Amino acid sequence: MPSNCAENWNKQSGIPYGMAFYKNSYVGRTFIKPKQSQRESSVKIKLNVIEEVVRDNRIVMVDDSIVRGTTCANIIKMLKRAGAKEVHVRISSPPFLYSCYFGTDVPSNEQLIAHSRTTEEIRELIGADSLGYMEIDKLKNMVGSLGYCDACFTGNYPMEVPGRDISHAFE
């Protein structure tokens, strides 16, 4: 959970900001692990809930994206086990709907939690009390004329992409 996203969200919302986890900095990005079991165990190793901060509180968790949903769902379970009354999730990007062929290790659309689900369906799957994403238009307004690839959000790729299933390439 990038702290700059959470800190900026805190400034805009006025909701108090605090750290709810001890983070093991030696564990890298969990969503890019090749197997589901590795992704799940990595989350448990990477983050330890600070129960005194979480217990009996409503938590707003801010993250940069939801790819498969594994990390987010496990974190929500950890927070609720630690006594959080509610866990609300805010994502600082639009839903990740399409495979990225230019840098993110996501081999197929079917592995993306948002590809064929509504926000409400995702909210239920991950166990959040509410879920909100940044709108694509707001993201475009923020970056202005800098230009960037938004294919993972829109499906509009800047060039021809592989037509083959690459889902086994990372196993």
Give short role names for the model-derived ranges.
Residues 1-171:
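PRPP-associated nucleotide enzymes
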